[in-house]
């Protein structure tokens, strides 16, 4: 489908030159496209500055444009001086490619295409810095990490190749507390251990347990924490109730050689058993 509109020449326009549009006060204005830009149209006749002209837009796949320099078949093209077509290696400004050779000043036929496959070299990317270009050229994860991470100890950590020196340096980087460093280096003193307990545990009763010297209150609270309740006291044993008994006093072996003395020794044993609560 053809689209037609009226435009005003913003400057003198020459036939078969590449054009760009701009917005005027009340009308579209046209002029030669700037160098190294993508054009919008191509002129098919001369137009003087300030004159109105009818712009007819056809669904064309190719243009004929004045060559601004010698052009070879297949050259990628961009806008040259005064709206001419010139070869370019900058993929961001390519608008087509030549299908025939042309010398400077001759008409060249070109296919309008921005989808032509273009090989982009990393070094040609203008907005990329040296570090970015180095990163784009890397094809291994470890190589990329070596560019992104400057610290040698951090590199060793990420690559899984830490030495003892790397480990110590990383601990110095990551931790400011000397007690934590001592723990990580397996060189804790009693003072370090006490300080670490204070860092890790807020409960006073647990701290008392860890110190190896819990108070009576600590013990009671710890038993409550673990659901042990209060200490169990055995009831006194009776003839009908199982209970606790005390150890009886020592009793020497009887040396009686007559009945009276044997009875006396037996009664002494019975007294000891009663006192211990073993018998009633």
Curated annotation (Swiss-Prot):
Gene Ontology MF terms: identical protein binding
Presence of the UniProt keyword Transport in the record: no
Family per similarity comment: Belongs to the phi29likevirus major capsid fiber protein family.
Pfam families to which the protein is assigned, alphabetical: Phage_head_fibr (PF11133)
GO CC aspect terms: viral capsid, fiber; viral procapsid
Listed InterPro entries: Phage_B103_Gp8
Organism: Bacillus phage phi29
Listed name of the protein: Capsid fiber protein
Subunit structure: Homotrimer. Forms a super helix coiled coil in the homotrimer.
Classification lineage: Viruses, Duplodnaviria, Heunggongvirae, Uroviricota, Caudoviricetes
Function (record text): Protein that forms the 55 capsid fibers. These fibers are not always present and may have been lost in some lab strains. They may enhance the attachment of the virions onto the host cell wall.
Keyword Transcription: no
Gene Ontology biological process terms in this record: symbiont entry into host cell; virion attachment to host cell
Main location: virion
Keywords associated with the record: Host-virus interaction, Late protein, Viral attachment to host cell, Virion, Virus entry into host cell
């Amino acid at each position: 489908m053809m689209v037609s509109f009226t435009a005003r020449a913003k400057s003198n326009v020459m036939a078969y030159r590449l054009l760009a549009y701009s917005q005027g006060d009340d009308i579209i204005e046209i002029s030669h496209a700037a160098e190294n830009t993508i054009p919008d149209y191509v002129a098919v006749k001369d137009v003087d500055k300030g004159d109105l002209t009818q712009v007819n837009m056809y669904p064309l796949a190719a243009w004929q444009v004045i060559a601004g320099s010698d052009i070879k078949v297949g050259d990628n093209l961009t806008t040259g001086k005064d709206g001419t077509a010139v070869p370019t290696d900058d993929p961001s400004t390519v608008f087509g490619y030549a299908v025939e050779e042309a010398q400077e000043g001759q008409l060249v036929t070109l296919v309008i295409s921005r989808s032509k496959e273009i090989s982009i070299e990393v070094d040609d990317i203008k907005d990329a810095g040296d570090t970015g270009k180095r990163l784009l050229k890397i094809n291994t994860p470890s190589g990329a990490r070596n560019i992104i991470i400057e610290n040698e100890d951090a590199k060793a950590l990420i690559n899984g190749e830490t030495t003892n020196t790397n480990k110590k340096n990383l601990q110095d980087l990551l931790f400011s507390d000397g007690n934590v460093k001592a723990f990580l280096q397996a060189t804790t003193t009693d003072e370090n251990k006490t300080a670490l307990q204070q860092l890790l545990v807020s409960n006073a009763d647990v701290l008392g347990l860890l110190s190896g010297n819990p108070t009576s209150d600590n013990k009671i609270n710890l038993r409550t924490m673990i659901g042990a309740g209060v200490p169990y006291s055995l009831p006194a044993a009776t003839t009908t109730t199982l209970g606790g008994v005390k150890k009886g006093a020592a009793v020497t072996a009887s040396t009686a050689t007559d009945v009276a003395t044997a009875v006396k020794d037996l009664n002494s044993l019975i007294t000891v058993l009663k006192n211990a609560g073993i018998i009633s």
